[in-house]
Amino acid sequence: MSAHISNVRPDFDREIVDIVDYVMNYEITSKVAYDTAHYCLLDTLGCGLEALEYPACKKLLGPIVPGTVVPNGARVPGTQFQLDPVQAAFNISAMIRWLDFNDTWLAAEWGHPSDNLGGILATADWLSRNAVAAGKAPLTMKQVLSGMIKAHEIQGCIALENAFNRVGLDHVLLVKVASTAVVAEMLGLTRDEILNAVSLAWVDGQSLRTYRHAPNTGTRKSWAAGDATSRAVRLALMAKTGEMGYPSALTAKTWGFYDVSFKGETFRFQRPYGSYVMENVLFKISFPAEFHSQTAVEAAMTLYEQMQAAGKTAADIEKVTIRTHEACLRIIDKKGPLNNPADRDHCIQYMVAVPLLFGRLTAADYEDEVAQDKRIDALREKIVCYEDPAFTADYHDPEKRAIGNAITVEFTDGSRFGEVVVEYPIGHARRRADGIPKLIEKFKINLARQFLTRQQQRILDVSLDRARLEQMPVNEYLDLYII
């Protein structure tokens, strides 16, 4: 005899309702959140512009079908593309994420909340261009900043206590959910329609972490966020037509997300949605490196300077010991061959060896031309990592959110340097005063990669004037980035 399952349509899951109520009703009052969102916007766009230097990224950009023309389509910064909002979202977020140089959120689940900008910016630009064509008011960049804060918050708050990586799911599912909610609200959907849209995001089959880990690490990790944001825009547009949703997408017995994909567990929440995530987000300012290694790379750069002063080189190194936190060991402690740039930028041994050898770590250092230097792999073999439980505890402490690494170098002559400890990277909220000037310099460098001096200055004049930027129509701001 089969078990009876009621066919009474349930109310929407509380987790979905909370997301929708937040995007529709929450008023952002935090000055710190808006200040940070402003810098986050600049940094994120700059990361996308740098990615245009890499053919592996550029080959994925443009319309799905060459020659497609979209009247009043969304612009893709640094290109001549004008696309439908779904494909524009893919283009923008793929650029943003390509070099692993945009922001980071570390918690039970990791991720990069500025990945959401692709969907937000593409939708806002498309809506603005169509509004102007119809004689109506466009959206402003202040609305983009508000959308960023809310997308950051949804992705980051769910990530605080819920480890999707533990069940093999990729964090871009949170990009899809967050972008769907924010974009749906931006599109003017009703509450019921946004509920439907968010439920559609949860019932999608979710991306696996296969492409982020040995032996399959590959470039999908660089366009997975673009895939997620484009899907979000697609689902929001479907919901706008009146497409139905699935109220117990998470909790349905046997067939819901919890039973199918989360081992029957339900989500835990540390705090209500507000503006906490944007206020505390981590910027990758100095090095394009997986964030659990940022402080290790900074320590390695300090050690390189000490070696220079002492007349030593990496050839004199006998052993390197890295005292670290558990998440670092689980994600980027990697031995054996590294097959491509995506493999290398997720290997702490590689990311420490390069600065110890050359006194630098740039995106180009992950390419084959640099990686074929046999000294790198030779030094990797001398690097040993172990967990310090205190570092792990500080990593999970919501009041600290430290990402500590400490490095000791021993030399073949029996000497050693004192351990270099870095607990907070320069992109951490505790080091904003140090970090923001460097972030702006990073933005300027990335503008110079794609634009002539006059165009760079036009972009900077608006971008660094917060009041002017916030009032500017989205379409006019993105027009500044046309090649």
UniProtKB/Swiss-Prot annotation:
Pathway: Organic acid metabolism; propanoate degradation; Carbohydrate metabolism; tricarboxylic acid cycle; isocitrate from oxaloacetate: step 2/2. It comes from Salmonella typhi. Keywords: Lyase, Tricarboxylic acid cycle. Its EC number is 4.2.1.79, 4.2.1.3. InterPro entries: 2Me_IsoCit_deHydtase_PrpD, MmgE/PrpD_sf, MmgE/PrpD_sf_1, MmgE/PrpD_sf_2, MmgE_PrpD, MmgE_PrpD_C, MmgE_PrpD_N. Monomer. It catalyses: (2S,3S)-2-methylcitrate = 2-methyl-cis-aconitate + H2O; citrate = D-threo-isocitrate. Involved in the catabolism of short chain fatty acids (SCFA) via the tricarboxylic acid (TCA)(acetyl degradation route) and via the 2-methylcitrate cycle I (propionate degradation route). Catalyzes the dehydration of 2-methylcitrate (2-MC) to yield the cis isomer of 2-methyl-aconitate. Could also catalyze the dehydration of citrate and the hydration of cis-aconitate. The gene is prpD. This is 2-methylcitrate dehydratase. One of its GO terms (biological process) is tricarboxylic acid cycle. NCBIfam families: PRK09425.1 (NF006943), prpD (TIGR02330). Belongs to the PrpD family. GO terms for molecular function: 2 iron, 2 sulfur cluster binding; 2-methylcitrate dehydratase activity; aconitate hydratase activity. It is an enzyme of class 4 (lyase).
